[in-house]
Amino acid sequence: VASSGIVYASFDRFPAPKGAAVHIRAFAEALGAAFGPVDLVAIGDAPGIPTPALSNAVTYHPLGARGKDLVAQALTFRAHLGAWWHGRPRAKVVHVRSIFEGYPIAQRKASLTDALVYEVNGLPSIELKYHHPDVADDAELMRKLVTQEDVCLQAADLLVTPSAVTAEYLVSRGADPQRLRVIPNGVDLDVFRYAPPRAPEPGRPLRLLYSGTMTSWQGVHHALDACRLLLRDLPVVLTLVGPLRKHTRRALLDRCGDLLLQGAVELLEPLPQEELARLHHACDVVLVPLPANDRNCLQGCCPLKLLEAMATGTPVVASDLPVVRALAEDTEVLRVRPGSAKAIAEAVKALLAHPIQGAALSAAARARVERDFPWGRAQEALVNAYADDLGIARASTRSNTAASASA
């Protein structure tokens, strides 16, 4: 049976105002433009979100993933994915982003696809405990997660990851370095436009921004503690914007405590990309306070929020970790000791006292992102990996070959 097309499957909500959805769209569109038809399969049962406008080469198939917990949701999604796949022709490539959709495909790889691409942005054996602390002591679940990850790592013909730290960890888990490609995240420079830092105004509170997941692995608690320290000396408002799970909302509100009553903290739901960019421009400093933990230092990551902040021109204070150093020099971002609210507060004060330093960081950060991290560069790297490592012919090459044959 002849193989046809690419299936890009992801156990992620799409569309959504999250980094994962931005990443999925960028990669699916690039694959469609380069190689022809792409079937994009993702979680699409969010109420009130319109179907995204995608290129003609990408067909979106939203699937449900309802369930009382993550395991139930994953099993529901797998069942829907299996039903969707029934009777479909064999794929040329299947591209997955996690074990939740990837494991059953890896098990049946020989009958489903010519090639399997496993894009590793994170691994549940490391990340799950931060979202669901009760699973940390479930040894049986952890064993299953590691086993399924290993099956996907071994079955993949191409492994893609956005971080060299992650690549090193995957090799330590037995991944073949010859099949591994590091492709950092990108930024839409037309959405995250540049503006120089805001000029200070007498009487206006200093406005800090934290964007992203409200979890300990991202360091939101360090941002709150730094806000408390700064309030001793000057008026401050810290804006927290991003997804907030129900069971973590209460803990976060407790952590905010008096800061909410004082009006020193505001909580915002996730914003569309254009509004998030405008919010950056309305703030004085962006905080990326990643802690030194196994998710950030062992598994690794490529924090999209850091790249987006650098693109906007608002000065950034970020943890001095390898995953940050890979994206930003100390002339582009003010890097501070991880896990230290005091270091964050002192860096913010330094920017306030030395606006010329903030302006220099701002311009250098934007220049770095324009040079190294436009989405086009990541898309080109992915297309090259498909062509060079998997031998997939570009659509233009196929049409030229067909035209020559018929001439």
Each PLM stretch: what is its role?
Residues 7-9, 200-228, 239:
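Conserved donor-binding/catalytic core segment of Leloir-type glycosyltransferases
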Residues 44-46, 237-253:
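Glycosyltransferase donor-sugar binding loop
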Residues 81-86, 103, 107, 118, ...:
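Membrane-proximal helix-turn-helix segments that form the acceptor-binding/catalytic region
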Residues 157, 280-299, 314:
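Acidic donor-binding loop of glycosyltransferase active sites
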Residues 165, 186:
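Carbohydrate-associated surface elements
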Residues 171, 187-204, 219:
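Acidic anion/phosphate-binding donor-loop and adjacent secondary structure
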Residues 242, 250-277:
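Nucleotide-activated donor-binding/catalytic signature segment of Leloir-type glycosyltransferases, i.e.
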Residues 306, 330-341, 350-356:
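Conserved acidic donor-binding segment of nucleotide-sugar-dependent glycosyltransferases
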